[in-house]
Structure formats: C-alpha cells, structure tokens
Amino acid sequence: MIREERLLKVLRSPHVSEKASAAMEKNNTIVLKVAKDATKAEIKAAVQKLFEVEVEDVNTLLVKGKSKRHGQRVGRRSDWKKAYVTLKEGQNLDFIGGAE
C-alpha cells in the first residue's frame, strides 16, 4: 500500500497539448506530468485515489529538457516524466472542459 502523502507528490499537473486532447477524445487517455521517480503502480494508484476513476493502463516516458540560450549563455531545461493514463470504458476525466 502506497502512503497517501506519496500519492499527492506523484502527480504534478495535466499536460495540455493538441496531441493530449486528441488522445483524450480518441482513446480515453489522459496525459499527466508526474514526478521523475514515480513508478507506474504509484501513478495508477494516485489517479484512482485522487480522481476516483478506474485505470486500465499506464505508459510512461522521460522527456529530455531542451537547450535554450539566454544571450550568450546556454542553459538547459529540466528533464521531466510524462504519463499516458488510459481509463477504462465508461470512465471520464475532463481537465480542459471549462477552459473555453
């Protein structure tokens, strides 16, 4: 059993993009930014507990930070982890419905 304190730290924010919106409409999949050290089991447990939906599958990937220039200095954005969470049939979770 994963502690509730850890579950609150696993999910960072929803990742809103055209691809994420298409995945939600087509495959009933939500896209989230998660903690870099989060496991698939922790992500699944956090989504089920916090949003009260049934999760079918979790796919994760590490997004590498881009190099950016600030004048002559070259900086780098942080790496972060993205999770594609597929919900079971009949389950719905809408992050961007009220953003019209």
From Swiss-Prot:
<dbReference type="InterPro" id="IPR012678">
    <property type="entry name" value="Ribosomal_uL23/eL15/eS24_sf"/>
</dbReference>
<comment type="function">
    <text>One of the early assembly proteins it binds 23S rRNA. One of the proteins that surrounds the polypeptide exit tunnel on the outside of the ribosome. Forms the main docking site for trigger factor binding to the ribosome.</text>
</comment>
<dbReference type="InterPro" id="IPR013025">
    <property type="entry name" value="Ribosomal_uL23-like"/>
</dbReference>
<keyword id="KW-0689">Ribosomal protein</keyword>
<dbReference type="Pfam" id="PF00276">
    <property type="entry name" value="Ribosomal_L23"/>
</dbReference>
<dbReference type="GO" id="GO:0005840">
    <property type="term" value="C:ribosome"/>
</dbReference>
<keyword id="KW-0687">Ribonucleoprotein</keyword>
<comment type="subunit">
    <text>Part of the 50S ribosomal subunit. Contacts protein L29, and trigger factor when it is bound to the ribosome.</text>
</comment>
<dbReference type="GO" id="GO:1990904">
    <property type="term" value="C:ribonucleoprotein complex"/>
</dbReference>
<dbReference type="InterPro" id="IPR012677">
    <property type="entry name" value="Nucleotide-bd_a/b_plait_sf"/>
</dbReference>
<dbReference type="InterPro" id="IPR001014">
    <property type="entry name" value="Ribosomal_uL23_CS"/>
</dbReference>
<keyword id="KW-0699">rRNA-binding</keyword>
<protein>
    <recommendedName>
        <fullName>Large ribosomal subunit protein uL23</fullName>
    </recommendedName>
</protein>
<dbReference type="GO" id="GO:0003735">
    <property type="term" value="F:structural constituent of ribosome"/>
</dbReference>
<dbReference type="GO" id="GO:0006412">
    <property type="term" value="P:translation"/>
</dbReference>
<dbReference type="GO" id="GO:0019843">
    <property type="term" value="F:rRNA binding"/>
</dbReference>
<comment type="similarity">
    <text>Belongs to the universal ribosomal protein uL23 family.</text>
</comment>
<keyword id="KW-0694">RNA-binding</keyword>
